[in-house]
Structure formats: structure tokens, C-alpha cells
Regions:
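A C-terminal functional module that forms or caps the active site or interfaces directly
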Residues: 76, 80-129, 133-137
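Surface-exposed amphipathic alpha-helices with a cationic face
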Residues: 14-18, 62-69, 88-95, 152, ...
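Amphipathic, non-transmembrane alpha-helical secondary structure
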Residues: 7, 11-15, 55-59, 109, ...
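Glycine-rich loops and low-complexity Gly/Arg-rich segments
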Residues: 24-27, 49-52, 101-103, 125-128, ...
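C-terminal helical cap(s) of enzyme catalytic domains, especially alpha/beta-barrels
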Residues: 114-125, 136-176
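Generic alpha-helical propensity signal that fires on short helical segments
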Residues: 17, 40-44, 94, 118, ...
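Short C-terminal domain-edge/linker segments immediately following a structured domain
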Residues: 5, 30-33, 107-109, 130-135, ...
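Conserved anion-binding
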Residues: 1-79, 97
């Protein structure tokens, strides 16, 4: 979902999904370069004044996940290609308790080192999408299988390493 009118504008849709045992993903920091100026813009008013738009989206999504045992059902889209933008955005994926959908690996240029940078300290909640990367190895079934196995191993190892990293970002308790 795209929160162009503010993350709270999605509240009705999010509540409908949650009330029906479903979940949603909200774009926060995407792999699309065109979105960077909007996502990293500093909010001029409202609850998250002085923070980035992406931070406000992530914080609002996290509020829907509070009180859940285990992983929440409101997720974020955080692109694997954003690299060091993650530091400038104020968004800390390691503090997020919902699923994180991460496009951009392979086909759009993200590599394992990018996963380790962006998802440092996460706790097994990152879903890396690789469909275009794998499809590029087709139509040969053996090549598709080999690409799938190879990329799965690479991503698994990168996310394990990211999970073991300690993030330097510390948020105030009320911001978590």
C-alpha cells in the first residue's frame, strides 16, 4: 500500500485486513530511486515533525503491531538497494516487529552486502523477493533450479550475518 496521504489514511484498510485475519505491506523505503526524495523528506508538521516521511510510516506501522505475540501483521516494504539511506531515514528495521518485504536483490542490483547493511540486527522477519532475478535464468529448468538454490543460500547467509550485527541506532522508548 502507498501512504501518499499519510500512513494514518490507511487505517481503515489496515483495520479491515487485521479484523479478517490478514496482513498488509506499506511502502516505507522502496528500491525505486524516484521515491527517495519523498521517502527521505523531512516532515514539517504532525506527530513525526522533523523526522523523515519513511520514519513516520514505519512508526505508524509499528503501532499496529504493538501487543502482538510474535510477528505483527502490518509489514513494511524496504528495498534492498537503499544502502546507507537507511541511516539517513531514521528507520531502524531491527526495531520493527512486523514482516519486511525487500525487493531489489539481484535484478535491481542489490547484493548480499546490501542486505547486511540495510537489515542489520533484524530478527528473521525479512522476506527478500528474487523472482525477476531467478526468472532471468530460464527457461531451462536446471538453470532455474541452480539459480534458486544459489540465491537462497546467499540470502540466508547474509540475513543470518545481518541478524548477528548490533545496530548503533538507539531510539527513545516512546519512539519504538
Amino acid at each position: 500500500m502507498l501512504p501518499y496521504y499519510g500512513a494514518r489514511s490507511l487505517g481503515g484498510v489496515i483495520n479491515d485486513a487485521l479484523n479478517n485475519g490478514r496482513g498488509v505491506f506499506i511502502a516505507s523505503l522502496t528500491s525505486n530511486q524516484e521515491g527517495a526524495s519523498l521517502q527521505t523528506a523531512i516532515r514539517q508538521a504532525g506527530e513525526y515533525k522533523g523526522r523523515t516521511v519513511a520514519y513516520g510510516i514505519a512508526s505508524t506501522a509499528q503501532k499496529f503491531n504493538k501487543g502482538n505475540d510474535g510477528m505483527g501483521s502490518v509489514g513494511l516494504i524496504i528495498g534492498a538497494t537503499i544502502g546507507q539511506w537507511i541511516n539517513d531515514s531514521g528507520v531502524d528495521p531491527s526495531k520493527f516487529t512486523g514482516p519486511i518485504l525487500s525487493p531489489g536483490y539481484g535484478w535491481q542490483g542489490a547484493e548480499t552486502r546490501d542486505l547486511k547493511t540495510v537489515f542489520k540486527g533484524t530478527k528473521g522477519n525479512v522476506l527478500v523477493t528474487v523472482s525477476r532475478f531467478i526468472a532471468a535464468h530460464g527457461p531451462d529448468i536446471a538453470a532455474l533450479s541452480a539459480a534458486t538454490e544459489s540465491v537462497a543460500l546467499d540470502i540466508r547467509q547474509a540475513l543470518i550475518e545481518a541478524q548477528n550485527e548490533i545496530d548503533d541506532v538507539v531510539l527513545d522508548d516512546e519512539e519504538e
